[in-house]
UniProtKB/Swiss-Prot annotation:
The modification Phosphothreonine is found at T48. SMART domains: BRLZ (SM00338). The modification Phosphoserine is found at S43. This is Basic leucine zipper transcriptional factor ATF-like. InterPro entries: AP-1, bZIP, bZIP_sf. It comes from Bos taurus (Bovine). AP-1 family transcription factor that controls the differentiation of lineage-specific cells in the immune system: specifically mediates the differentiation of T-helper 17 cells (Th17), follicular T-helper cells (TfH), CD8(+) dendritic cells and class-switch recombination (CSR) in B-cells. Acts via the formation of a heterodimer with JUNB that recognizes and binds DNA sequence 5'-TGA[CG]TCA-3'. Residues 26-89 form the bZIP domain. The lineage of its organism: Eukaryota, Metazoa, Chordata, Craniata, Vertebrata. Residues 28-50 are annotated as: Basic motif.
Length: 125
C-alpha cells in the first residue's frame, strides 16, 4: 500500500501550507471586495445620471405643458371673440336671412385675400 500513500503525499504537496492558504484567501477576498466596491460605485453613478436625466426631461415637459396651456387659453379667448363677432353678425347678415336672394358672384382681387374680413386689434394676422 505504499503506492496509495504516495498519492496522498502528492496531494499534500499541491496544496499550500495552511498559513499560506489563509493569506491567499485574504488576498482574493480583498480583491473581490475592491471589485465589488468599484462596481457598486459605478452603479450609483449610473443611477444618479439616470435620475438627473429624468429630472431634466421632467422640467422640459413641464415647460412644454405650460406653453401648451397658455396657447389653449389664448385660442379659447380668440374663439370666444370670434363667436361673439359671429353672433353679432348673424342677425344682420343678408346671406343668412330667410327668403334673401342668392348672393351675387363676387370677384376678388388677389389683394382682397390679404385683408381680414373682421378687423380685430387683438387678433391681427
Amino acid at each position: 500500500m505504499p503506492h496509495s500513500s504516495d498519492s496522498s503525499d502528492s496531494s499534500f504537496s499541491r496544496s499550500p501550507p495552511p498559513g499560506k492558504q489563509d493569506s491567499s484567501d485574504d488576498v482574493r477576498k480583498v480583491q473581490r471586495r475592491e471589485k465589488n466596491r468599484i462596481a457598486a460605485q459605478k452603479s450609483r453613478q449610473r443611477q444618479t445620471q439616470k435620475a438627473d436625466t429624468l429630472h431634466l426631461e421632467s422640467e422640459d415637459l413641464e415647460k412644454q405643458n405650460a406653453a401648451l396651456r397658455k396657447e389653449i387659453k389664448q385660442l379659447t379667448e380668440e374663439m370666444k371673440y370670434f363667436t361673439s363677432v359671429l353672433s353679432s353678425h348673424e342677425p344682420l347678415c343678408s346671406v343668412l336671412a330667410p327668403g334673401a336672394p342668392s348672393p351675387p358672384e363676387v370677384v376678388y382681387s388677389t389683394h382682397a385675400f390679404h385683408q381680414p374680413h373682421v378687423s380685430s386689434p387683438r387678433f391681427q394676422p
